[in-house]
A protein has these predicted regions:
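Acidic, two-metal ion nucleic-acid-processing modules in DNA metabolism proteins
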Residues: 1-115
């Protein structure tokens, strides 16, 4: 007989796989900021993108105190943190602990040139 799993069981299993991966525990990712939203709770929700992909990210209010600039769409940044699964939604994302500004992103500049 086939083993049938609940959605929650699958999400928990996938989360455990992420937790066990030592590369994802402390990773730095370079990209351009997109869809940057400052939540009333103090959290920052944003995406990192490049020519080949998109990665959902969040910086919780407690880590935001160390942010030395006001992040916005189009910023080219390096984000340090942990990639993990938000178990309820089954979505993986980068939980940012550190964000370093590198300047304006080329993708955003090309977008502005088209306007």
């Amino acid at each position: 007989m086939k083993t049938i799993y609940s959605v929650g069981q699958v999400n928990r299993y996938v989360k455990n796989m992420f937790v066990q991966d030592f590369v994802l525990k402390k990773i730095y990712v370079k990209g351009e900021v997109s869809n940057c939203k400052y939540h009333p709770s103090g959290h920052i929700y944003f995406s990192l993108k490049d020519e080949t992909g998109l990665l959902s990210c969040v910086m919780f209010a407690g880590h935001r105190r160390g942010l030395a600039f006001s992040m916005k769409d189009g910023d080219k940044v390096v984000v340090g943190g942990t990639v993990d699964v938000y178990e309820r939604d089954g979505r993986y994302q980068l939980y940012a602990r550190e964000i370093i500004l590198e300047g304006a992103g080329a993708l955003y500049e090309r977008f502005l040139a088209l306007k």
